[in-house]
Amino acid sequence: MVRDEIEALVARERPGWRVADVVEVNDESGPTFEVAVERGDERRTLLVSADERIVGERR
């Protein structure tokens, strides 16, 4: 999964939000991505799985 794919996922699943940063995290379950997204003054972190699903969100 590359940044372009993550940006497309965020655009589809979280309209109005933009990707600010992407960090790849590898653990025993395989690669996942911590994705910082922004909308105005709001900022959140999404956890995205390698199979292109948002599996968690932190405010």
Predicted region positions:
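A short, surface-exposed beta-strand/turn
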Residues: 42-59
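Conserved histidines in hydrophobic membrane contexts and catalytic metal-binding motifs
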Residues: 28-38, 42, 50
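Short, non-transmembrane alpha-helical segments in secretory-pathway proteins
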Residues: 1-24
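Acidic-residue sensor for enzyme active/binding pockets
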Residues: 24, 34, 57
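Hydrophobic aliphatic residue packing
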Residues: 6, 10, 35-37, 48
